[in-house]
Every structure is written in structure tokens, then in C-alpha cells.
């Protein structure tokens, strides 16, 4: 498995790789290749981590390069992968390579490698660019990374188009994303399998509220309904839409807003009252924030299938989000959450006000949300379906190779 992010878990892709790997059956050998992260390797100076917390013994981790969130570090990791991954694959007699949508295998040719490659499509440059162009017309608060995506979008989009070809096989985490790949990239539908990401509903659970109160006593003392925004402080996440909605909410009812996530606070005008700003939080913190919150809000302009929504639903939060990407596949509007149009601060304010004022509605929505996650989103099942897809791909690849070699 090739991934730009892994341990320590700081994003949805890293968590996806972790959960799929550790939920495979015991006889599946998994070798994860990822950039080096010094905090993880402090006690492992050889750069190879055979086991780590939460990893079973059949999972090995090799660190190549250094972790970073920048485009140029992504390119560096692609170069490193092109040099070392074929060697690792031959030495360990790898049956299949599973890559992620940051395209770490961009410079590796599946036909030359003679090993099938499956890529999970989490997001696309094109999708980001379209959302940011729309946001830029009504907002001047784009983050530096968002401005870079707008600037380089056309170039990166061409690189992306060269990657998404019928030489590879694909997993998408939503039906919406599968259709995007068919329509925009011309990928054969038979080469795409939809396998949803999931949530660990034992970790993300309202039963952890006492732990949460001990961890955040100042939030536990807040009596007003608590509204959590836990995501990157970025325009494409609808941050400025939320900030425009908050004054309208507070003019009608009482509520307390909690902001947590990566990004610089000064880039956005925070409300003058009724809020707590936590900034970037460690990976063990989100379950406590969900458990303490009544409402979760993610007013994104572009998403695929955001894990944070499932985590909030598992925690019995009433979720308010937008009708973009795969989100409508996750939420049944009015039953286990609320869906609104993107970039609509008035609709957002109305929905937040209604939920803040109606405790019974919040509770019913949260209960149905957790039931939905438990019934539909199980990591063990997702890992099993992923393994089944691997087996199908390997069988197809072997058949085509035998036909080619005659």
C-alpha cells in the first residue's frame, strides 16, 4: 500500500489505510510505504517499523522520504516510489499494489511492473479547482494552499488526467466519485469498485462523554447547544459560509460554536462571542469533541465522502452539511441529518437555529444517525470487500498476461 500520509494519523487518507490494513484477515501480508515522520521513528532509527500501535504483526511499514503537505514533497515521494517500490515488489513477490489519490505511483508503469495497481480515489484536483473558482468569486479568504491549487490547477489537472487511465484499477469511496471518473476520465466502469469508507463506532461513541468532560472541563460547563466545526480552516470547507451564518444564529437563539482543525485562525474573522477556538488537535481528541457536541456542521463546497461526517453521526451528533459530492449518499435529509445547498449562509443559519432550538429533534436525528453508521459502515466489511476486489483484479491481470504471452 502506497500512501502520502499514515502514522501519526492526521487525515482521512491515513486513517483509511490504517483501518483497511488492520482489518484484513491475518493471512494477508501488507507492506505500507509512506514518507518518514520523525515523531513516529524516534525509537526506530533503522527506518523500518515492523509493527506499531494498532497494527497487527502481518503489517509492515517502510518509511521513504519525509512527510509534508506540499505539492513538491508529493513529487519527491513519487520519485522515491518509482525508484524503490518496484524493487520492494519484486523482492517480496507482491501480488498487487494499492495506491492512494495523491498518486505516489505516478511514475510507475503498471505494464512494465507487471503487477496490477489499484488506486483509491479520495479526491481530485479538478474537483478542488472547480469549487475554489466558485468560492473565489464571493470570498477573498482563500488559504495559501487554496490559492496555489487555483494557480496550478490547469497544470495539475493535466497530470491527473494522464494518471487516471485504463491501465489501472480503481476504488472509489462513493457512487458519485465513480460517476465522475467515468464521465471526466473515461474510465471503464468495470475497472471501478465502490467501497465506502467507514467509522469506528466504538471509538466514536456518545458513551465517551464522561471522558470528554474530564478532558475539556471548560466545554462541559457550557449549557448552550454546542455546534462543532472539525475540519481544515479553509474556504472549500465552507468556513467563511459558516462565519457569515453565525451572527444570524446568535441573533435568534443561544448556541456555542467550537472550531478545531488545521489552518491559521487570523485568515478568518471569528465570532466575537459564544465560541471556543482549539486550532489543530491531536488525533486522539476528535472523539471527545464529538461526544461533547450536539450539532456537527460541515458546509463544504466540495467533498467526496468525508469521514468526519460518519464520525459525528456515530457520536449521535445532529449533522448539517451540503448537497455536494457523495454527502447525499451518507445523509438522509431530515431523518439522520440535514442537507442544504452549498455556499448558502441563510439556509445554514436556518438549519442551525432550528436544531439549536429543538432538543428533541437533535436527539432523534442523532439516534438515527448512529444506527445508520452501525448498520452501513463497518471497517471489517470494507476490508473484506477490498480483499475480494484484489483477488478479482489479480485474476483478471493473470488471465490477460497469459493471453498476451501466448
Where are these regions (language model features)?
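Short alpha-helical donor nucleotide-sugar binding micro-motif in glycosyltransferases
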Residues: 281, 288-293
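Aromatic "clamp/platform" in nucleotide-sugar-dependent glycosyltransferases that forms part
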Residues: 282, 301
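A short helix/loop element that forms part of the nucleotide-sugar donor recognition site in Leloir-type
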Residues: 47-49, 205-220
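Conserved donor-binding/catalytic core segment of Leloir-type glycosyltransferases
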Residues: 219-237, 243-247
Amino acid at each position: 500500500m502506497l500512501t502520502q500520509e499514515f502514522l501519526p494519523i492526521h487525515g482521512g487518507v491515513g486513517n483509511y489505510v490504517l483501518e483497511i490494513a488492520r482489518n484484513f484477515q491475518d493471512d494477508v501480508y501488507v507492506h505500507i510505504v509512506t514518507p518518514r515522520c520523525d515523531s513516529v521513528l524516534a525509537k526506530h532509527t533503522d527506518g523500518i517499523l515492523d509493527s506499531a500501535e494498532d497494527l497487527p504483526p502481518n503489517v509492515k511499514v517502510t518509511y521513504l522520504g519525509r512527510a509534508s503537505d506540499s505539492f513538491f514533497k508529493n513529487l519527491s515521494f513519487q520519485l522515491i516510489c518509482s525508484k524503490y517500490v518496484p524493487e520492494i515488489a519484486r523482492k517480496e513477490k507482491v501480488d498487487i499494489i494499492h495506491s492512494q489519490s495523491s498518486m505516489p505511483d505516478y511514475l510507475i508503469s503498471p505494464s512494465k511492473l507487471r503487477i496490477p495497481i489499484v488506486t483509491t480515489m479520495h479526491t481530485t484536483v479538478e474537483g478542488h479547482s472547480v469549487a475554489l473558482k466558485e468560492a473565489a468569486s464571493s470570498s477573498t479568504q482563500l488559504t495559501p494552499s487554496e490559492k496555489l491549487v487555483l494557480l496550478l490547477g490547469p497544470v495539475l489537472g493535466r497530470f491527473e488526467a494522464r494518471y487516471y487511465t485504463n491501465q489501472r484499477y480503481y476504488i472509489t469511496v462513493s457512487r458519485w466519485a465513480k460517476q465522475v471518473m467515468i464521465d471526466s476520465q473515461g474510465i471503464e466502469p468495470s475497472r471501478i469498485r465502490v467501497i465506502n469508507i467507514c467509522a469506528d463506532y466504538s471509538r466514536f461513541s456518545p458513551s465517551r462523554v464522561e471522558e470528554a468532560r474530564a478532558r475539556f472541563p471548560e466545554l462541559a460547563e457550557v449549557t448552550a447547544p454546542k455546534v462543532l466545526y472539525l475540519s481544515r480552516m479553509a474556504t472549500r470547507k465552507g468556513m467563511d459560509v459558516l462565519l457569515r451564518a453565525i451572527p444570524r444564529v446568535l441573533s435568534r437563539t443561544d448556541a456555542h460554536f467550537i472550531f478545531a482543525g488545521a489552518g491559521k485562525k487570523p485568515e478568518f474573522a471569528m465570532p466575537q462571542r459564544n465560541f471556543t477556538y482549539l486550532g489543530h488537535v491531536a488525533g486522539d481528541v476528535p472523539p471527545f469533541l464529538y461526544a461533547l457536541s450536539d450539532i456537527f456542521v460541515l458546509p463544504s463546497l466540495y467533498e467526496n465522502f468525508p469521514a468526519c461526517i460518519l464520525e459525528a453521526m456515530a457520536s449521535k451528533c445532529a449533522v448539517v452539511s451540503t448537497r455536494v459530492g457523495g454527502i447525499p449518499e451518507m445523509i438522509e435529509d431530515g431523518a439522520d441529518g440535514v442537507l442544504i445547498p452549498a455556499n448558502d449562509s441563510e439556509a445554514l443559519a436556518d438549519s442551525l437555529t432550528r436544531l439549536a432550538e429543538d432538543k428533541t429533534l437533535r436527539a432523534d436525528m442523532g439516534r438515527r444517525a448512529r444506527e445508520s453508521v452501525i448498520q452501513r459502515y463497518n471497517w471489517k466489511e470494507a476490508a473484506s470487500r477490498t480483499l475480494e476486489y484484489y483477488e478479482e483484479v489479480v485474476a483478471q491481470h493473470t488471465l490477460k498476461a497469459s493471453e498476451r504471452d501466448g
